[in-house]
Amino acid sequence: MMVILRPGPYVCAEWEFGGYPWWLQNIPGMEIKRDNTEFLKYTKKYIDRLYQEVGPLQCTKGGPIIMVQCENEFGSYVSQRKDISFEEHCSYNAKIKGQLADAGFTVPLFTSDGSWLFEGGCVAGALPTANGESDIANLKKVVNQYHGDKGPYMVAEFYSGWLSHWGEPFPQVSASEIARQTEAYLQNDVSFNFYMVHGGTNFGFTSGANYDKKRDIQPDLTSYDYDAPISEAGWITPKYDSIRSVIQKYVKYPIPAPPAPIPVIEISSIKLERVVDALLLAQSIQPVNASTPLTFEQLNQGYGYVLYTRHFNQPISGILEIPGLRDYAVVYVDGEKIGVLNRNTRTYSMEIDIPFNATLQILVENMGRINYGSEIVYNTKGIISPVTVAGKEITGGWNMYRLPMDKCPVLTEFGDNVCRNTPLQAVQFKDRPVIYEGEFTLDQPGDTFIDMRAWGKGVIFINGKHIGRYWKVGPQQTLYIPGVWLRKGENKIVIFEQLNEVPQQNVNTVRKPVLMNLK
């Protein structure tokens, strides 16, 4: 199998921050995606290290890599960042290409952009390829224009489906349309790369987000099924069969049969034996104190949650406003839930009444950094601007408790705070963030999908593996668990449930994903 490598350093791909490490934002003088000394220093480090791993695998050295991409859809960024001169954009783009060449990449280099954005995305010496281009005559016209009147002609991203956001319908593209376009490419000697041919999963906190003026942020699902020809779990679909039938007409050998289906199991009930109130974690975590709320980055935390608290010696009431919320917050006073603020719905304020000697608690979640477009440069998380009540900024006495949740919480570390998850305790913990824990035994592991339709919002760990976020708004209501992460015998599950509006005693898995249930 031959490989076309698209290494970035910017990859987009609905990945958190487009593949950039969050801590770049903490480096003084750093400006990403431009001709900036600090940024280019780190891109060079990355590319040089990348070459150590994959350089020997180029076809020029007997390996499978036949092409390497420079940057990614840079033309769209150029079109959105008119505040940066076109000359600087071109200089940056050329320097990334130069770093790839200097590192030792000798296979052909290429760029990928929408065909109408080639002017900003193309770089001398690299083949321009088009993303999402179905007009073959136009494809050949623009490639000729920017590549010396010659091909080859390639669609680097032929969209077999589309990306999915929380709170929005799951996009679908018909199998017949994909088959028709596949045949058109083959008839006209156009190379193409299905994006995606195989769906996947944004495990952990790796899913990114888009920016939208109406919704501000559009967080991506954990599932990256993409309505692809091969599903998230590796299942062939009618779309795959349609594509296979078309391709068979253009090759002189029989295409091998698809592999046998992966075993799938169903777990009818997993009892969640133990529970801990996450608001009590402040008793076991050393807080960071500041006069104003600090961002995740200032707290040296990339992902997960931060609990912001502030004690009041005098009563105060009115409108609580957090215009700089990034991205989702559940607000409590002395552990009693007051409401939810949500950047995705542009809900930044609520009525609040804080009595004498009470504590305001704000549990803030990073829902994923923007991975595409000009807003990628504004990606700090947490509370990034003043908090006000009745128009008055609340300063002094802020405590911040870091809950990164990048690793599975170990409930035994919380001592006496851990309770048996009985019906009585469930009522007591209603509307409070909790961590559930349980065990289950399997005779034979297999792929499965954990069913979260009865739950609210949170993350799940299976045998220590972070399988991602769930959220009742949908459309995704199940999370994929690869069978290789399950064991014959005892297995452990840990669930962090942020809302706990309907406390649970059990959870189950199903044999098929639920990806189109929007609430």
Predicted regions and their residues:
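A cross-kingdom feature marking solvent-exposed beta-strand/loop segments within repeated
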Residues: 216-217, 223-225, 239, 293-298, ...
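Aromatic-lined ligand-binding clefts that engage carbohydrates, nucleic acids, or primary amines
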Residues: 317-332, 360, 440-463, 470-471, ...
